[in-house]
Amino acid sequence: TDTDEFKAINDKYGHPVGDEVICALANRCNQKARKVDFLGRYGGDEFILLLPGTTLEDTIHVAERIRKEIGSTPIVTSAGAIPVTISLGVASVQCDEDTVISLLIRADKALYVAKQKGGNLVIAGKLTREGPIFEIHPSLV
């Protein structure tokens, strides 16, 4: 996940408020995750959510649920309520050759596509015979 326009939040309200936003985002993501899932801060305003034992379809739906939750209610900070949206890149193990690194790369590229399309989206990175493709899942259109 990546917070849309996070630099603008830091620039307008300052880094301490930006930190409040990051903490609130982590809490909201954790509330929508299962007990077996793992949420970690990847750096800056980026998070990784590992969903063991899920299909790509299930992962997309969890990501969409989180995206809607974040965007539906402004985050209350010491500077007031701040509307926030996030973009999510999703990848799932699809073959025996998949590694943690290949999944991170595919999810990161999917996230980049989401940001290019204006943000506030879930984009799935899938493997095909022709190589990886990045698309909005049909069930989310």
Say what each PLM segment does.
Residues 49, 84-86, 124:
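HATPase_c (GHKL) ATP-binding subdomain of two-component histidine kinases
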Residues 1, 47, 86-90:
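A structural signal for short, well-ordered beta-strand segments
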Residues 2, 44, 107:
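Conserved metal-coordinating catalytic motifs of nucleotidyl cyclase and c-di-GMP turnover enzymes
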Residues 53, 90-94:
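PAS-family sensory domains and close relatives that share small-molecule sensor folds
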Residues 60-63, 93-124, 130-141:
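Catalytic-core segments of nucleotide cyclases and related cyclic-nucleotide turnover enzymes
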Residues 5-53, 57, 61, 65, ...:
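Cytosolic catalytic cores of cyclic-nucleotide second-messenger enzymes
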Residues 41, 70-86, 103, 115:
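Catalytic core regions of nucleotide second-messenger enzymes
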Residues 54-57, 80, 98:
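Conserved catalytic/ATP-binding subdomain
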